[in-house]
Amino acid sequence: MDLVTRRIRGALGIAGPLLFLEGVPRARLGEVVRIRGEPEANGRAAEERSGQVIALSRDRIAVQVLEETRGLAPARAEVTLTGQVARLGVSRGMLGRVLDGLGRPADGLPPPVPEARPAIHGAALNVTRREKPSDFIETGVSAIDGMNTLVRGQKLPVFSCAGLPASRLAAQIVCQARVRGGEAFAVVFAAMGSPFREYHAFLEAFRAAGVLARTVVFLNRAEDPPIERLMTPRCALTCAEHLAFVHGLHVLVVLTDVTSYCEALREVALAREEVPGRRGYPGYMYTDLATIFERAGRVRGRPGSLTQLPVLTMPDDDLTHPIPDLTGYITEGQIVLSRDLDRRGVYPPIDVLPSLSRLMGLGAGPGKTRDDHRPVADQLYAFYARGRDVRRMAAIVGAASLGEEEKRLLAFADAFEDELVGQGGTFRTIEDTLEAGWRLLSGFPPAALTRIPERLLRARSARPAAGAAAVSGGAVA
């Protein structure tokens, strides 16, 4: 036993997943602990459990046990404090693997051979070394690519409501996402608090689409301890940082569901007997979420990038709830799913009006996607917003009372939702999306297209067949 390792026999007691000790010298918050019970009746050594120090007082500590505490006798427990914080062995060999929430193999294969073992809490990127996010990540989803473009190095959350197909959308993005130009690309997917049916659906979707080879999957199940849920996104990001900044890959990290993470954060905070903040969540939840989201970005002089797409469920459909509220302050926009669109059978039910990508200008337009990307998106936004206003007015006065222009806008809003947003499970390139936008705009006279420069309208008029191009795409399982 080295100088930093301390071994203690006997604990004060156990309460649920918590183990309480006293008289522990030099204990540190977040320190990794190993726990072993008394030998079994047949003489076989007891199974070793692991844990983490989550609370310190003057003479006592609380340890969150990562496995079950059933059958563990406090008086006979042997506890070893390792003096180490949680670390993860990372390597490029993690691609194609399915791991549990702590990075241990969950696919029956041996652990990947590590190239390094960094601490999972990571280190903040030096602000003077941060590169501005730029370039386009194609998700294959028109409402994102065309209207709220995702940029390499960005953190763009998806705000969902209970019962909406956020998990299906997350799986679809994992299956479809790519970078243009043939650069190396990978996806790190982390599910937090997923029930059995959901995480098996994720795996089946990834295997059916043939994308598992370029994906690292971290699965934290609903029955796993809350402290593991707090470590899962950090393990995923530690892996992603290694792939991005050591191997030069462009990495998209999809985290779902951040609400499950925050519930676990609240549960652990209550176990520590901390003073609760808004709605029972700890007052430091903003800082804690920032330690996750701020790990996205690009580093000057390094070829890779780390982009985040966290998915969260808004409790009670409340956009002002602490979880989406604080997330919105840290991230760079939001993709909002609509219960009304879902009720009408539109998938994905993305409401583009409250949705926003603040960095869209860095990844869309000349040299990034297409010259007409921003003008077409702006014009679609303008007509759709007016069409939504007309729809509300028609609900009061009746559609028969509308003028010709209002009827045209109302028809546009319906077609926009059904044809552009409601693409189903198909993959669309950015060219497919923009051609679909032009096709919708073709129902208006050129004089009404005030957001599109004259030179683009003239160039478009020289391509009469392009405006009638059909929306294409391949089905994604």
Swiss-Prot record:
State any single GO MF term: proton-transporting ATP synthase activity, rotational mechanism
Which protein family is named in the record?
Belongs to the ATPase alpha/beta chains family.
The keyword Ion transport is annotated on this UniProt entry: yes
Function field: Produces ATP from ADP in the presence of a proton gradient across the membrane. The V-type beta chain is a regulatory subunit.
Pfam families linked: ATP-synt_ab (PF00006), ATP-synt_ab_N (PF02874), ATP-synt_VA_C (PF22919)
Gene from which this protein is expressed? atpB
Q: Does the keyword Ion transport apply?
A: yes
Q: Name one GO biological process term.
A: proton motive force-driven plasma membrane ATP synthesis
Q: What name has this protein been given in UniProt?
A: V-type ATP synthase beta chain
Species name:
Anaeromyxobacter dehalogenans (strain 2CP-1 / ATCC BAA-258)
Q: Superkingdom of this entry's organism?
A: Bacteria
Q: Keywords in alphabetical order, please.
A: ATP synthesis, Hydrogen ion transport, Ion transport, Transport
